[in-house]
């Protein structure tokens, strides 16, 4: 079987700081494989283990409602296609990926400051894709979870709208009630509200990360190791 031995050079960035040079090469099955070339810093993203796993974890899981169709529609189901289309951007942090010879900077791609694609936001929520042209990037490709959700940029900030199960829709109510308890225990907890979006009950919360503050999940901090309550405290 003939296969291409070409390789594409990429750079893992943190805003405008180059962190890692790496390359992608296709194997005999035309599957992309990623290889580290040179780190420019002793620091690593929290939870970083292997490059391939790190990049895969930046992509929305296929089990998230409506997302697999979106990934396929825009050529993001392939790991390298995901990098080229989305730059592995996320609203969790300020890491991103560019091709080594691309004249891009953080200001060009930041999800915190640039417009979102409304078409993709709506498709991520209800599964209806009305256009195939990706004119602007979207945080939907890098948002995990199970139920349908989407990000909306409003006058007062960026908000996450989350729906629930198709039959009972109790999950938004559960999140709203849990937030009331959380605010009693911790006044700095993220506030949740309820509402309707595209005729569905949703929970709504503001984005709590920024270009200065990121989100690191406990699974990344502890790298999957079990911890007891006393150890956590």
Predicted region positions:
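Phosphate/dinucleotide-binding and metal-coordinating scaffold of catalytic cores
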Residues: 1-233
